[in-house]
């Protein structure tokens, strides 16, 4: 039996980039397991290594090329997939590392498997029964990313994602719901809905009607959110483009059907800069919508991202952005100094902002937002809330509230936690806060 196990091909896997890339990795790993391959956590024990790359910004390209180089040095047999593989037909990778066995773009499961088969033939009689219904996941067992579409129809001038991942392709709604149901049945307590543009879900198929559990469902974000809310777990929406119909999901949040959490990348507040970015709306429209959202759902948490130092951004336009920030009072914010990305249309725009000015603006922006975030967190002191346990160590636990997405938001630290496990919901009382996180005490042993 031992000799048979040694003959089973083993594959190492490196996954870089965003949650959408993580889902691609999970799909590849699921197929590998279905075909009888084993996975290895070390380069030494692997017969071959797959590296799923990111190519969005220069630092991501550098990280991906470094990871490929490390895999080649430690193992020697490397297949590259992901967004970096789509750049210049894979030439960026091949020029840096000509020894790689194959290069593919993102969401290229058939091509990756073909390369694996060529360089490491699949074993006979794969034990497909070893595959759980929810597939192979790289996240903790109690939460999972649910990717509802690929690609994007927008052509934001700072972004090259459409050139790497293509135009919008929505997954059939019955497929999404079946995957969500399998995940929940496997013990997942939180579904994180992701795509390049979640609010555009179904646009490419004209909101086609599908069927789930014998009832019709439109391929549309609102209908999907409502149906996911029936599964009895936390449902969190990410990457929501600020279309008008986004307003329709806010009542679902107020009713407790989905989490009162919205991740909306506003990017800027200056109408001229937004136009140069080829982004919709303007700051006044966005501010009025934020006010309406909070009127309908007072507990809503708003996360957004912004770019400072975009080509041509004047001091007055930066001040306009800061005024928007003060007025909007967003809960969670990420800010990036504009970085030219090879192939992005914005590179051709005039009046680039000097690097030192970009960094000064980013630091100023984040100092203001940190104060806003700290003040909003401090308002939660003395309140009770349900949190989801992520980790337990001795008598302490780390959890997240409805306001906290994994990896990107804050945490809730619980001292003297009793009888709790990762993936459980418990009630806590907030006793103090800092600029990013909350500290709490456990209210009772009762778990929900």
Swiss-Prot record:
SUPFAM superfamilies: Radical SAM enzymes (SSF102114). GO terms for biological process: tRNA modification. Keywords: 4Fe-4S, Cytoplasm, Iron, Iron-sulfur, Metal-binding, S-adenosyl-L-methionine, Transferase. [4Fe-4S] cluster 2 binds at residues 152, 156, 159. It holds the Pfam family Radical_SAM. It catalyses: L-aspartate(89)-[ribosomal protein uS12]-hydrogen + (sulfur carrier)-SH + AH2 + 2 S-adenosyl-L-methionine = 3-methylsulfanyl-L-aspartate(89)-[ribosomal protein uS12]-hydrogen + (sulfur carrier)-H + 5'-deoxyadenosine + L-methionine + A + S-adenosyl-L-homocysteine + 2 H(+). Its EC number is 2.8.4.4. Binds 2 [4Fe-4S] clusters. One cluster is coordinated with 3 cysteines and an exchangeable S-adenosyl-L-methionine. One of its GO terms (cellular component) is cytosol. Residues 138-375 form the Radical SAM core domain. The keyword Cytoplasm applies. Residues 9-121 form the MTTase N-terminal domain. It is found in: Cytoplasm. Belongs to the methylthiotransferase family. RimO subfamily. This is Ribosomal protein uS12 methylthiotransferase RimO. It comes from Nitrosospira multiformis (strain ATCC 25196 / NCIMB 11849 / C 71).
